[in-house]
C-alpha cells in the first residue's frame, strides 16, 4: 500500500469534528474581531473617520459574518461565555469547551495582530510613537475595553454581567424553535442586530466586552506588542472583569430564559406539527448538501 500523501493526511485530520469545530471558531472569531477592532481603530485614530455607532455596526455585522462563516459547523459561538453557558446547561459536552475557547482565543489574538499591522502607521502617528494605555492619546483601547473614570470596578462588573445576560437570553430566544425564532436563514443577521442594539443601548459604561474571547486575547497582544503591564493594571486591575463577569451573566441569562420562558411556551399540537414538518424539510436539504461534500450540520440551536 502506498504511503498517504500529506494532502490526504491533512484532509483526514480536517474531517474530524473537533478539528473542524476548532477551525470554525478560530476563523469566525477572527472575522468578527477584524471588523470590530477595525471599526474601533477608525473611531480612535481618525478625527472624522469613525464613530461610536460605527463601532457597534462593525461588531454587529462582524458577528453576522462570523455566523455565516461557521454557523453550520460549530454554531459560531465566537464567545467563551456563550460556550460556557451551553456546556453548563447541558446543551453541549464539556469536552468541547477547551476546543471552542482555544479556537476563539487564537482567532481573536490573530485579529488583534492583523489590526495592529493594518493601522501601524496611524497608531504611531496618533501618539507620536508612544504606546499609551490611558489619556487622550491612548491607543490600547483600540484592542480591549477600559473602565471610564466615572465607573467603579464593581459597577463595571454588574454592567458586564447584565449586558451579557441580555445577550444570552436573547440568543436562546432567537434560536428557540418552540417560541418565535428568527426566520430560517436570517439568524446571522438577527444575531448581528442584537449585538448592535446592545451596544447602542447599554455599551457606554464598560465598553460592552460581553465576551472573554473578545477582550483578553487582544489585551495579551497589546502587552506583548509594547503597551506593557499597564494594560492589566489600568482601571484598578479591570482586566479580569470582562473575563469573569460575562461567564456569570451569560449563565444567569440562560437560566432566566430556560427557567421562566421556555417551559411556559404553549405546546400547541398543530404548531409542533408545523415545526416538525419544517425540520424534516431542513434535514432533507442538508442531507442533499452533504452528498455534495457540503457540511450539513447547522447547530445554531447551541446558542
UniProtKB/Swiss-Prot annotation:
Intramembrane region residues: 75-88, 207-220
Keyword Transferase recorded: no
Keyword Cell membrane recorded: yes
Membrane topology listed for this record: Multi-pass membrane protein
Site features described as Important for permeability to glycerol, chain residue numbers: 120
Catalytic activity: glycerol(in) = glycerol(out); H2O(in) = H2O(out); urea(in) = urea(out)
Tissue: Detected in proximal tubules in kidney. Detected in the capillary network between muscle fibers in skeletal muscle and heart, and in spermatids and on spermatozoa tails in testis and epididymis. Detected in white and brown adipose tissue, especially on small blood vessels (at protein level). Detected in kidney and white adipose tissue.
Free-text description of this protein's post-translational modifications in UniProt: Phosphorylation by PKA could prevent the interaction with PLIN1.
Extracellular side: 40-52, 118-152, 203-206, 221-238
Loss of function: phenotype: Young mutant mice appear normal and are fertile. However, they start to become obese after about 12 weeks and display enlarged adipocytes. The effects on plasma glycerol levels vary between experiments; some reports find no significant difference in plasma glycerol levels in fed animals. Others report decreased plasma glycerol levels in fed animals. After fasting, mutant mice display lower plasma glycerol levels than wild-type, and increased glycerol content in their adipose tissue. After fasting, mutant mice display lower blood glucose levels than wild-type.
MF (Gene Ontology): glycerol channel activity; urea transmembrane transporter activity; water channel activity
Regulation affecting activity: Glycerol transport is regulated by pH, with the porin being permeable to glycerol at pH 7.4 but not at pH 5.5. Water permeability, however, is not influenced by pH.
Keywords: Cell membrane, Cytoplasmic vesicle, Lipid droplet, Membrane, Phosphoprotein, Repeat, Transmembrane, Transmembrane helix, Transport
TM annotation in the entry: 22-39, 53-70, 97-117, 153-173, 186-202, 239-260
Chief site of localization: membrane
Residue ranges annotated as motif NPA 2: 211-213
GO BP term, example: glycerol transmembrane transport
GO CC annotation, single: cytoplasmic vesicle membrane
InterPro entries according to UniProt: Aquaporin-like (IPR023271), MIP (IPR000425), MIP/Aquaporin (IPR050363)
Residue intervals on the Cytoplasmic side: 1-21, 71-74, 89-96, 174-185, 261-303
Family: Belongs to the MIP/aquaporin (TC 1.A.8) family.
Record comment regarding domains: Aquaporins contain two tandem repeats each containing three membrane-spanning domains and a pore-forming loop with the signature motif Asn-Pro/Ala-Ala/Ser (NPA).
Complexes and interactors: Homotetramer; each monomer provides an independent glycerol/water pore. Two homotetramers on opposing membranes can dimerize, forming a cell-cell junction. Interacts with PLIN1.
Record PANTHER family: AQUAPORIN OR AQUAGLYCEROPORIN RELATED, AQUAPORIN-7
Protein name as catalogued: Aquaporin-7
Organism: Mus musculus (Mouse)
Designated gene of the protein: Aqp7
Amino acid at each position: 500500500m502506498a504511503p498517504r500523501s500529506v494532502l490526504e493526511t491533512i484532509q483526514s485530520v480536517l474531517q474530524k469534528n473537533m478539528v473542524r469545530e476548532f477551525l470554525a471558531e478560530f476563523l469566525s472569531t477572527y472575522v468578527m474581531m477584524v471588523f470590530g477592532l477595525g471599526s474601533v481603530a477608525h473611531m480612535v485614530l481618525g478625527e472624522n473617520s469613525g464613530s461610536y455607532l460605527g463601532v457597534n455596526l462593525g461588531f454587529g455585522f462582524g458577528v453576522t459574518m462570523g455566523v455565516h462563516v461557521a454557523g453550520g459547523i460549530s454554531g459560531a459561538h465566537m464567545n467563551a461565555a456563550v460556550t460556557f453557558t451551553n456546556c453548563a446547561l447541558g446543551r453541549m459536552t464539556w469536552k468541547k469547551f477547551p476546543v471552542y475557547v482555544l479556537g476563539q482565543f487564537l482567532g481573536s489574538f490573530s485579529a488583534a495582530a492583523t489590526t495592529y499591522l493594518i493601522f501601524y502607521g496611524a497608531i504611531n502617528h496618533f501618539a507620536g510613537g508612544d504606546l499609551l494605555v490611558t489619556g487622550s492619546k491612548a491607543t490600547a483601547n483600540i484592542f480591549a475595553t477600559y473602565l471610564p473614570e466615572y465607573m467603579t470596578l464593581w459597577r463595571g462588573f454588574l454592567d458586564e454581567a447584565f449586558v451579557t445576560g441580555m445577550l444570552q437570553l436573547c440568543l436562546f430566544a432567537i434560536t428557540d424553535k418552540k417560541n418565535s425564532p428568527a426566520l430560517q436563514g436570517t439568524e446571522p443577521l438577527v444575531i448581528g442586530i442584537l449585538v448592535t442594539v446592545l451596544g447602542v443601548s447599554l455599551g457606554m459604561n464598560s465598553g460592552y466586552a460581553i465576551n472573554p474571547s473578545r477582550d483578553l486575547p487582544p489585551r495579551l497582544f497589546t502587552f506583548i506588542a509594547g503597551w506593557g503591564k499597564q494594560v492589566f493594571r489600568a482601571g484598578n486591575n479591570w482586566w479580569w472583569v470582562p473575563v469573569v463577569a460575562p461567564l456569570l451573566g451569560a449563565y444567569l441569562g440562560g437560566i432566566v430564559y430556560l427557567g421562566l420562558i421556555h417551559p411556559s411556551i404553549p405546546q400547541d399540537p398543530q404548531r409542533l406539527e408545523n415545526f416538525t414538518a419544517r425540520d424534516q424539510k431542513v434535514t432533507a436539504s442538508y442531507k442533499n448538501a452533504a452528498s455534495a461534500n457540503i457540511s450539513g450540520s447547522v447547530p445554531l440551536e447551541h446558542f
